[in-house]
């Protein structure tokens, strides 16, 4: 659903700012945690992960260009891992994500894979296309080889 804050901001044409406010709120209260990731059989563990996003589009909530080279047609998942940074540095990097310029900062990693499984030391909030997926310590995402067939009416 739409939050009361988003409704107010929508009246002024600023609805996308709600995502920035949510990100700032999460950053203030979030403690980074140890996370282990397996991507296509390759494992990596980080001790101070702020968040991981698995995407097949460039943009996420409010226009953040977290995975600037993501494509829905390449058959790959694009993954961003933000880890090992101070909260101040994450705060500094966040606005650059609107333009996809955050990838140059140390502690921000971009990967491509077909399958990913994530295991966290503490339960984390999971979001699926902007909707809550609950609180979990593990999750997996796979890119399926089939594409959705679309039926589009003739334009007359």
Regions found by a protein language model. Name each.
Residues 1-156:
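Long C-terminal subdomains/extensions of small-metabolite kinases
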């Amino acid at each position: 659903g739409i939050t009361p804050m988003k409704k107010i901001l929508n009246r002024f044409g600023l609805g996308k700012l709600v995502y920035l406010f949510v990100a700032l709120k999460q950053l203030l209260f979030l403690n980074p945690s140890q996370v282990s990731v397996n991507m296509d059989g390759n494992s990596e563990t980080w001790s101070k992960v702020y968040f991981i996003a698995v995407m097949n589009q460039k943009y996420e909530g409010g226009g953040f260009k977290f995975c600037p080279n993501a494509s829905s047609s390449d058959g790959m998942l694009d993954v961003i891992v933000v880890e090992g940074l101070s909260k101040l540095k994450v705060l500094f990097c966040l606005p650059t994500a609107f333009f996809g310029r955050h990838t140059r900062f140390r502690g921000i990693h971009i990967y491509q894979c077909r399958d990913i499984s994530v295991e966290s030391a503490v339960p984390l909030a999971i979001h699926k296309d902007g909707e809550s997926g609950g609180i979990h310590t593990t999750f997996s995402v796979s890119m399926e080889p089939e594409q959705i067939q679309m039926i589009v009416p003739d334009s007359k």
